[in-house]
């Protein structure tokens, strides 16, 4: 059974051929990957399934009406029978069975999450139940994909010509599984597969949801933001009162870090360490360093990551103050953040529902899901779930992690065992995606791989610790010694301590072990003030 693509639809009112070509173009635009483009051309080819077409028209077909595994089967046939065409279409891809298997898996799983490519239980990657249902359908329908692939690629592909060939292909799909990659390519391989999957998912949802115009608008906003950001930030800094001893020292440190990053950028560095004392103005320093990267390397999205919600709110307040009049470039995205435009549309919909407002609402949701704003303020959790994750909805953000500047403050809040691992991972990611990262801290954590971990050093073979932006001599400056510790040596009871604390006009902290004494001090405070 052959098919005419011009008679098949991917979504209501959208021709399948148009959808496949649109998604392929978008994927190539997102990643510049030939493999992503080819995968996208095949990802929904299984929608030629007559039962799927009936379902799309509102009927209730009685047979197999799925499409993703059918698409993967068609892709597998093409890869096995046309290795030379594949190499011509994807000249830069990994030359391995693992790469081909992973591409087939992406097609089969593009509506779900990116699966474990080497399952711990020894089972194949793909669902045996789904594969069995697919083969039962193929035994009845005898579907041919030759003319469909020819129309999409513009070339005549070879296809299985015997029952035996088809049997071998089916057996391969049923038992599909990867083998471990060599350590020296494993990380690059994983990042490539993750990138292809995320590009397909984003491109597919962009075309299906008709938000292509928003992608163009996001790109224009990013260029506009990058053009104005350095001047606006500099104007804000010039208006600050820098006459106090503390502010003079802050300015000195900031200028030193800027000179250092200029040198690092000239040397081709992409990941930097900003270790500076508490109170030295790291927020403005980080924003200034991002400005230098944009001036040197062109338009970049800024993703400002922080460990705690309370700090994201503080940074948002500071950034909005700097970018007054351009607040629409900035969006804080965490579990407590809000989008004022989103709230306004909801109110308008309640009063006067319209298709236009619904489309704008969907576009705003998509923009937030994909981190489509020029300046994002978010939590480490959101960043790590995307960088290290496999979830479909989280990987929607990953394409916008390319060509950006990560500002990661308070990096010491990570578990110490992850310091070296995460920075090495981030370093590799930045090198492959044209991104830059500045990790900031006041406590000087060791950002190196463990000396006794041979596997880690093989896995991150070319890792070097981040380029240091500041001398540690600034810690010796008394202007940053803002705390005094007074040890109470005499024995006093809780009520005496409570009275003593309340009499202090200025007190930063009172440290007690978290035990019954701490609870009694709290109870004393409640009795005193209700």
Predicted regions and their residues:
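Accessory nucleic-acid engagement/destabilization modules that flank
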Residues: 1-231
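Conserved pre-motif I regulatory segment
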Residues: 19, 237-275
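Walker A/P-loop
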Residues: 267-290
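Conserved Walker A/P-loop ATP-binding site and its immediately adjacent core
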Residues: 299-323, 331-338, 446-448, 518-519
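Conserved strand-helix element at the start of the C-terminal RecA-like helicase core
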Residues: 301-312, 504-529
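Inter-Walker segment of RecA-like/P-loop motor cores
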Residues: 325-388
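SF2 helicase catalytic motif II
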Residues: 381-383, 394-432
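Interdomain hinge/linker at the junction between the two RecA-like core domains of SF2 helicases
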Residues: 443-505
């Amino acid at each position: 059974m052959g098919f005419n693509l011009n008679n098949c639809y991917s979504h209501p009112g959208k021709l399948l051929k148009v959808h496949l070509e649109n998604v392929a173009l978008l994927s190539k635009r997102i990643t510049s990957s030939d493999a992503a483009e080819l995968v996208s051309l095949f990802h929904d080819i299984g929608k030629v399934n007559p039962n799927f077409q009936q379902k799309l028209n509102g009927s209730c077909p009685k047979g197999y009406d799925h499409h993703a595994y059918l698409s993967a089967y068609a892709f597998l046939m093409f890869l096995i029978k046309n290795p030379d065409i594949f190499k011509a279409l994807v000249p830069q891809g990994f030359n391995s069975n693992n790469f081909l298997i992973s591409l087939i898996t992406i097609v089969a799983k593009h509506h779900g999450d990116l699966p474990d490519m080497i399952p711990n239980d020894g089972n194949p990657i793909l669902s045996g139940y789904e594969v069995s249902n697919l083969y039962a359908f193929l035994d009845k329908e005898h579907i041919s994909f030759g003319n469909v692939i020819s129309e999409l690629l513009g070339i005549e592909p070879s296809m299985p010509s015997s029952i035996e060939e088809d049997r071998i292909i089916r057996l391969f799909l049923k038992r599909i599984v990867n083998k471990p990659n060599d350590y020296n390519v494993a990380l690059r391989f994983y990042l490539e597969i993750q990138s292809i999957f995320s590009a397909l998912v984003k491109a597919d949802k962009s075309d299906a949801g008709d938000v292509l115009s928003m992608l163009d608008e996001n790109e224009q906003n990013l260029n506009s933001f990058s053009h104005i950001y350095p001047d606006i930030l500099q104007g804000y800094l010039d208006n600050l009162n820098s006459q106090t001893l503390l502010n003079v020292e802050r300015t000195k440190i900031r200028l030193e870090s800027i000179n250092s990053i200029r040198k690092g950028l000239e040397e081709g560095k992409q990941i930097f360490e900003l270790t500076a004392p508490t109170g030295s103005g790291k927020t403005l320093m980080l924003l200034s360093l991002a400005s230098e990267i944009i001036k040197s390397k062109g338009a970049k999205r800024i993703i400002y990551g922080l460990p705690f919600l309370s700090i994201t709110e503080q940074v948002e307040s500071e950034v909005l103050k700097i970018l007054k009049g351009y607040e629409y470039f900035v969006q804080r995205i965490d579990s407590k953040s809000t989008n004022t435009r989103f709230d306004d549309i909801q109110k308008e919909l309640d009063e006067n529902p319209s298709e236009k407002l619904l489309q704008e609402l969907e576009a705003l949701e998509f923009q937030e899901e994909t981190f489509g704003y020029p300046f994002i303020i978010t939590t480490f959790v959101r960043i790590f779930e995307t960088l290290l994750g496999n979830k479909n909805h989280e990987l929607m953000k990953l394409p916008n992690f390319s060509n950006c500047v990560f500002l990661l403050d308070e990096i010491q809040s990570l578990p110490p065992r992850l310091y070296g691992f995460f920075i090495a991972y981030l370093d590799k990611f930045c090198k492959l995606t044209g991104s830059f990262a500045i990790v900031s801290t006041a406590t000087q954590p060791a950002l190196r791989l463990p000396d006794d971990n041979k596997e880690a050093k093989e896995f991150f073979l070319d890792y070097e610790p981040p380029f240091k932006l500041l001398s540690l001599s600034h810690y010796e400056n008394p202007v940053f010694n803002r705390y005094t510790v007074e040890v109470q040596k005499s024995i006093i009871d809780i009520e005496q301590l409570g009275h003593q604390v309340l009499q202090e006009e200025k007190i930063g902290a009172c440290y007690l072990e978290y035990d019954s004494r701490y609870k009694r001090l709290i109870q004393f405070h409640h009795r005193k003030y209700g």
